C-alpha cells in the first residue's frame, strides 16, 4: 500500500496537500532550515479543519542533531503539548558527535511519544556517520 505524506508548515499548505491527494501530513515550522518543532495552536487548526493524520517534526533548532539534556527535556515537553493538541505521531532524530544514532536520546524521545507512531527524521539519516564538532 502506497502512502503519500506531504511536509507542510502552514494551514494553507496543509489544505493544498489534502487537495493534492495527501494521505498524511508531516507538520513542522521553518522548512527553510530543514524544519523545526511546530506550534500547537496551528496543529489544532489543521486537525479541526482537515481529516488527515498528522505527524509532527520534533527539532528544537536548526543545525545538527546533537541535543543537550536541556534540549531533550524541551522536546519531551513539546511532544506532550503536541500530543494533547492532536498529533497522531512524531518525526524524531538524535545523533552522537561520532555521527551514530544517539540511542539513549532516542529512547528518551520514544518514551515521550507514549506509543504514538514514530518516523526517523530524514535529515538525521543524512548526518549519520558524519562526525560533528560542537562549536
Model regions and ranges:
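Active-site-adjacent beta->alpha loops and helix N-cap segments on the catalytic face
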Residues: 32-50, 96-111, 129
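Conserved, mostly hydrophobic/aromatic
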Residues: 17, 82, 121
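Hydrophobic faces of well-ordered beta-strands that scaffold small-molecule active sites
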Residues: 4-6, 25-27, 54-58, 90-92, ...
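Glycine/small-residue-rich loop that forms an oxyanion/phosphate-binding "nest" at active or ligand-binding sites
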Residues: 46, 52-101
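Single conserved hydrophobic/aromatic residue that forms the stacking wall/gate
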Residues: 126-135
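Active-site mouth loops of central-metabolism enzymes
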Residues: 1-9, 60-74, 120-125
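Glycine-enriched alpha-helix->loop->beta-strand junction motifs that scaffold or abut catalytic
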Residues: 20-25, 50-52, 86-89, 113-116, ...
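Hydrophobic, well-structured mid-protein blocks that either form specific transmembrane helices
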Residues: 87-125
Amino acid at each position: 500500500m502506497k502512502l503519500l505524506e506531504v511536509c507542510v508548515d502552514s494551514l494553507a499548505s496543509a489544505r493544498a496537500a489534502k487537495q493534492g491527494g495527501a494521505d498524511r501530513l508531516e507538520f513542522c515550522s521553518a522548512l527553510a532550515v530543514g524544519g523545526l518543532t511546530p506550534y500547537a495552536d496551528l496543529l489544532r487548526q489543521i486537525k479541526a479543519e482537515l481529516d488527515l493524520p498528522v505527524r509532527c517534526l520534533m527539532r528544537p533548532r536548526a543545525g545538527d542533531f546533537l541535543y543537550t539534556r536541556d534540549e531533550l527535556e524541551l522536546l519531551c515537553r513539546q511532544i506532550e503539548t503536541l500530543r494533547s493538541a492532536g498529533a497522531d505521531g512524531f518525526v524524531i532524530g538524535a545523533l552522537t558527535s561520532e555521527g551514530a544514532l544517539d540511542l539513549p536520546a532516542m529512547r528518551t524521545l520514544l518514551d515521550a511519544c507514549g506509543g504514538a507512531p514514530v518516523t526517523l527524521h530524514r535529515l538525521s539519516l543524512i548526518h549519520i556517520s558524519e562526525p560533528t564538532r560542537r562549536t
